[in-house]
């Protein structure tokens, strides 16, 4: 946000980030795609290595997936579009909201299940107040449900009930979108925005389609494409699980440490 105080804060943070980059022996980023498009990371290209993040979810409690489906009328209100994020402008909630009329035209019983903090989000009250009148209409009609924050076990019951997960983020504060991998591990395709890094899970694993940043019509088109032909977006879940397995990721860090130790001799 504009203002003298925020300018001072940004200057201090930029200085600290630059010192960290200069003094570090090496920098790890989740994807080369994000690094290449980052004004900060691209300055340190010679000391960058991309390593995917570890991702794992607990198993759902016995009967939890079915209980979730019954409680939220998943069989009657399909397809189910999931979003797992804070209610914030940068997360692109408004883009999904603007896409809903186009989605409902094709699928009149579609619903959005929103997992994540949505009330009293710091700095987002004006955004919340502006969008909520429209969202409340969808809530009344059974097209939108908020859950608030869910713990990992609850998320393990959330994902299997989705037909698609969307990550319509708008700026580079989103570097990857780990929730996409959690969804894919449950066989759920994703529709992210084309932000560097955020587009990589779908690009790498083929489970979904990338939508233009901030474009509600393209987001709707991408979601509809995935919903219309889900078999087309089935991925190799075993391979995906292996790529993000904590032990596999740890091995990549061990290789990096070995290279750095050898280089330092």
Language-model segments: what does each one mean?
Residues 10, 14, 18-50, 55-59:
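A short, active-site helix/loop in glycosyltransferases that binds the activated sugar's phosphate group
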Residues 74-91, 97-100, 113:
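Conserved donor-binding/catalytic core segment of Leloir-type glycosyltransferases
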Residues 160-174, 188:
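Acidic donor-binding loop of glycosyltransferase active sites
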